[in-house]
Regions:
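Intrinsically disordered, low-complexity segments enriched in polar/charged small residues
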Residues: 7-8, 15, 97
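C-terminal segment of classical bacterial N-terminal signal peptides
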Residues: 14-25
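Positively charged n-region of N-terminal signal peptides that target proteins for export
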Residues: 1-11
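Alpha-helical transmembrane segments
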Residues: 188-195
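Folded, non-transmembrane soluble domains that reside on the lumenal/extracytoplasmic side of membranes
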Residues: 23-184, 188
Length: 195
């Protein structure tokens, strides 16, 4: 019972802390829930402005929420659960879906979460593959503004693909010309040997 009480208390404090941070930032930005909240102070002010503008442009273009949140700590919460909680509380209201990247500096972890609608447009394999690959090197090197910009650019690219093709980008459906050539050679060899 004490563990359950501790977990509930932790979740309530987490939501109050995040809510307070969003409210303060939202008032300054004139937006209800900002697309970029740098609670861990990782990005220079000039880069914050550019990044916020970029994320808003992506959101406007595609009718989605595309956000980045940095925090000093998740207050002991698993990064995935923390990201999902923030997603559900602040970004799950976009009719065409939402995607959120959360970075916690206390344990140097990050997580990208999508809502149900967005999962039909950017599949989980792409989030952990192509999307991650777009920003991970800059993130590891501490080039946070570049990492977040690359994240936004890749989300924009994936959403453009979805809007053009009518389906989510799926790397497993790409045709491999190398595999096709090998298959052609093998079938030629087998076909030539059978008479």
């Amino acid at each position: 019972m004490k563990k359950i009480f501790a977990i509930v208390t932790l979740l309530v404090s987490l939501l109050v802390a995040v809510s307070t941070g969003f409210t303060a930032t939202a008032s300054a930005a004139g937006q209800q829930y900002p697309s970029f909240v740098d609670g861990a102070a990782l990005v220079q002010p000039v880069d914050k402005t550019k990044l916020l503008s970029k994320l808003r442009e992506i959101e406007s273009k595609h009718g989605i929420r595309c956000a980045v949140l940095t925090v000093k700590t998740t207050q002991g919460m698993n990064i995935r659960d923390y990201a999902q909680s923030v997603q559900d509380q602040y970004f799950a209201n976009a009719p065409k879906g939402s995607i959120l990247m959360v970075i916690s500096m206390d344990n140097r972890k990050w997580h990208i979460t999508t809502d149900k609608t967005m999962r039909t447009k950017i599949i989980d394999d792409v989030v952990t593959g192509d999307l991650k690959d777009a920003f991970i090197n800059d993130l590891k090197k501490g080039r946070y503004a570049a990492a977040f910009t690359n994240y936004g650019n890749k989300v924009d690219e994936l959403m453009t693909y979805y809007e053009k093709e009518g389906e989510a980008y799926d790397p497993s459906k790409k045709f491999s010309f190398g595999a096709g050539a090998v298959a052609a050679i093998i079938s030629f060899l087998i076909g030539g040997g059978v008479k």
